[in-house]
C-alpha cells in the first residue's frame, strides 16, 4: 500500500497480489494526526498490508519539502500502532503525472481534483514496484 500525504487529504493506493501493478484505492480527508493514523491503520489491517510506501515530497532541486513536517509525525504514529515495514519513495512530479493519467483514462475534470492524491499514490507505488523489480535482476 502507498500513501500520498497532502495538507488536506491522503491518497491511498494498493498493489495486486503479484505486486506488479498499482491501482488507486481512495482519498481520505485529513482529520488530525490520530484520526488519520487510525484510518490508515484500518486500511492496513483490512488489506493485510505488510509494507507501506510513503511518498516523500521533494523539490526538483532534491531539497525536502516543508510538507515532511506533517508526514513524519503521521508515519511515526502509524509505526507506533502497527509493525508495518515503511519505505520512503521520491514523489517528485507525481501530481503532474497523476493529472496526465486521469486525462488518459478520461476521468471527468470535475472528479480529478478529488482523485488526484489517490492517483499520485498509485504512481508512487508503481515507481516503488518498478525499482524493486530492477533490484532483483
Role assignments for model-derived ranges:
Residues 3, 8-137:
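Phosphate- and other anionic-substrate recognition elements at nucleic-acid/protein interfaces
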Amino acid at each position: 500500500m502507498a500513501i500520498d500525504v497532502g495538507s488536506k487529504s491522503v491518497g491511498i493506493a494498493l498493489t495486486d497480489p503479484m505486486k506488479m501493478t498499482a491501482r488507486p484505492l481512495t482519498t481520505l480527508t485529513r482529520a488530525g494526526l490520530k484520526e488519520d493514523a487510525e484510518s490508515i491503520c484500518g486500511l492496513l489491517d483490512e488489506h493485510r498490508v505488510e509494507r507501506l510506501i510513503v511518498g516523500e515530497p521533494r523539490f526538483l532541486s532534491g531539497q525536502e519539502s516543508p510538507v515532511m513536517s506533517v508526514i513524519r509525525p503521521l508515519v511515526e504514529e502509524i509505526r507506533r500502532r502497527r509493525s508495518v515495514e515503511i519505505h520512503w519513495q521520491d514523489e517528485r512530479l507525481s501530481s503532474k503525472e497523476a493529472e496526465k493519467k486521469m486525462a488518459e483514462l478520461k476521468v471527468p475534470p470535475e472528479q480529478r481534483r478529488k482523485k488526484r492524491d489517490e492517483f499520485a499514490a498509485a504512481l508512487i507505488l508503481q515507481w516503488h514496484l518498478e525499482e524493486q523489480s530492477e533490484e532483483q535482476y
